[in-house]
Design a protein with these regions (language model features):
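Dinucleotide-binding Rossmann-like beta1-alpha1 core, especially the glycine-rich loop
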Residues: 69-151, 461
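C-terminal catalytic lobe of FAD-dependent flavoproteins
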Residues: 175, 183, 266-269, 274-320, ...
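Core beta-strand elements of the Rossmann-like FAD/NAD(P) dinucleotide-binding domain
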Residues: 24-26, 244-255
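Glycine-rich FAD pyrophosphate-binding loop
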Residues: 45-66
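N-terminal Rossmann-fold NAD(P) dinucleotide-binding loop
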Residues: 37
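Extreme N-terminal leader/targeting segments of oxidoreductases
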Residues: 1-28, 43-47
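Flavin (FAD/FMN) cofactor-binding and adjacent substrate-gating region
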Residues: 113-192, 200-210, 229-234, 315, ...
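Glycine-rich Rossmann-fold phosphate-binding loop(s) that bind the pyrophosphate
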Residues: 32-34, 56
């Protein structure tokens, strides 16, 4: 088995090694365990930097497990004239389709051309032609009405004149983050979850900080060496609090990078910087595939406001999204769908799939993510740009904005910005493949070809070890999902699982795939957790209660 992610698994949280780990001399301290932070960790580690990533909650806890699950160029950006962003995204999509096969997969989209509705056939065909040109291949096709209805049999037929099909891609966003983190670990990167930044440390404040918090030799109290040394007020590290043990630590680094996404303004405020982000919420519905059966994705324009909405098959269920509204709730709390957003998305479904007569009780789960969007003052949230930004302020490099698809580009841009602050480091910063292709799995009669490809994509070089570690019956799928029991055991054993929600919402996606968050399979989940994590009956009961309370408050349909 490959070395596991730092931070855990054992009944005590596996945190005993943290003081020695944090006392090392680090080149980069990366704050934030989503796709942006993971990407920076990977690109830094593979180029020889000593890089440490800390995440205050769980890896992919924020936006990176609550995205729309699409790896796409963004057709709508063409309408806004953002050709550079679309071209960059399309190229990264093509890289990921090749390099992360089984995790990033092609997804065909169908878009109906309805009489009198925008954008209209000619405009949409023009956009798709540009899209294909950027990808270097033709993936668009126009179909007359009858043929389009055969491809998408449940869509509304009134006023339908035909339709277009085009290709994008989809992924399991949380598993993409974990795959990147595992790859970074292979190159010497270190990632720790449930380790929150309480305060940024600044050069010149070391003595005061050490006196106030009782830092001891060997616990990160060393003076910083490098570009920031001697510049009073410059960020040079962080005071951390362990979310599992409540212990406090200090860590120093030559450069501190904030990759905290929609939460970036919080760290920036410690240095007196004014807010620059506009958190926007994107909410989604999850329905059973049998109630909304789709052979391919369906893209549509919402009848109320003309915004794009999609429905597509994902992990054995059907996803519907997304909204785009200002998120004004407390950023310290998890985002959740609102009653108005449920109504908005259901209205889109009723308009596009009238004969299915979908109702709210069909919904298995909901989820909401908060996008880190740079505030430009647009009255319409959907008009805000989706480009990434880098700000260097008193030694803190903030990397925010951008899209899931372009995480590699964002990471390389961050390292280019960091390079002048890391004297003596002159690595080549040209793009490299995100992943090296893992060897094929040995034949196993309990796994189909598609299941084997899925495991290779999600676990890379560790896929064979996962299969070999499976107990009898653990290569079977769970409750109609595409997840197998062996994935639960593997995650509990070696993927820094600290809480039940980590296992069911991010290491696997059972919390989105099964009704009630997976309550019907809890007995078997319990057996795995107690065997691999050493949880007592009391601990299991507390974890189950906390998870189900979280699921009911943030992943179910809100009460009217």
């Amino acid at each position: 088995m490959s070395p596991r992610l730092n931070g855990g698994g054992a009944a005590d949280g596996g945190r005993d090694e943290l003081p020695a780990l944090l006392a090392r001399e680090w080149d980069l301290l990366i704050i934030g365990g989503g796709i942006t932070g993971a990407g920076i960790l990977l690109e830094a580690a593979r180029r020889g930097l000593k890089a440490l990533l800390v995440e205050q909650r769980d890896f992919a806890w924020g936006t990176s497990s609550r995205s729309s699950k699409l790896v796409h160029g963004g057709l709508r950006y063409l309408k806004e004239g953002k050709f550079g962003l679309t071209r960059e995204s399309v190229r990264e999509r093509e890289h990921l389709l090749r390099e992360a096969a089984g995790l990033v997969e092609p997804q065909s989209f169908a878009f109906g051309d309805y009489r009198g509705r925008k954008p209209g056939r000619r405009m949409f065909q023009l956009g798709l032609a540009i899209y294909d040109l950027m990808a270097g291949q033709r993936a668009r096709h126009h179909y007359p009405r009858d043929e389009f209805l055969a491809l998408a049999p449940n869509v509304a037929s009134a006023e339908l004149e035909g339709g277009m099909c085009y290709t994008d891609a989809k992924t399991d966003d949380a598993r993409l983050v974990l795959r990147v983190l595992h790859e970074a670990q292979r190159h010497g990167g270190v990632a720790v979850n449930y380790l929150a930044v309480e305060q940024l440390l600044r050069a010149g404040d070391d003595a005061a900080q050490d006196a106030k918090h009782g830092a001891k030799a060997g616990q990160g109290a060393k003076p910083v060496q490098g570009a920031t040394a001697g510049q009073n007020g410059t960020v040079c590290g962080a005071r951390l609090r362990d979310g599992i043990t409540e212990a406090t630590h200090q860590v120093r680094a030559r450069l501190v990078v904030s990759a905290t996404g929609a939460w970036a303004d919080g760290l920036r405020a410690q240095g007196g910087a004014a807010p620059r982000l506009r958190p926007l919420r994107g909410s989604h519905l999850v329905l059973p595939a049998w109630r909304l059966p789709l052979a391919q994705a369906v893209s549509l324009m919402h009848p109320a406001d003309g915004r794009p909405v999609f429905a597509f098959p994902w992990e054995g269920v059907t996803l519907v999204g997304t909204t785009d509204v200002d998120h004004r709730a407390n950023m310290a709390h998890e985002a959740a769908i609102t009653r108005a957003e449920v109504d908005y998305l259901m209205a889109a479904l009723h308009d596009q799939f009238p004969q299915l007569a979908l109702v709210e009780r069909d919904i298995i789960a909901t989820y909401a993510g908060v996008r880190p969007v740079i505030d430009s003052g647009q009255s319409d949230p959907s008009k805000e740009g989706r480009e990434h930004a880098l700000w260097l302020e008193n030694g803190l490099l903030t990397v925010t904005g951008g899209k899931l698809t372009t995480f590699r580009v964002i990471a390389l841009d961050a390292l280019k910005k960091a390079a002048p602050l890391l004297p003596g480091w002159n690595a080549e910063l040209q793009p490299q493949p995100v992943f090296v292709q893992p060897p094929p799995l040995r034949y196993n009669r309990h796994l189909s070809v598609s299941q084997a490809a899925r495991l290779r994509g999600r676990y890379g070089p560790q896929a064979q070890a996962l299969v070999d570690a499976a107990h009898d019956g653990e290569l079977e799928t769970i409750g109609g999902s595409e997840t197998i029991w062996a994935q639960l055991r593997w995650a509990a054993r070696g993927e820094a699982v600290q809480k039940l929600e980590d296992l069911l919402l991010r290491r696997t996606r059972l919390g989105l795939q099964l009704r009630g968050g997976g309550v019907e399979v809890m007995a078997r989940v319990r057996a795995i957790c107690q065997a691999e994590l050493g949880w007592s009956d009391v601990r299991w009961s507390a974890e189950q209660n906390a998870y189900l309370a979280l699921w009911n408050s943030h992943y179910s349909v809100p009460v009217a």
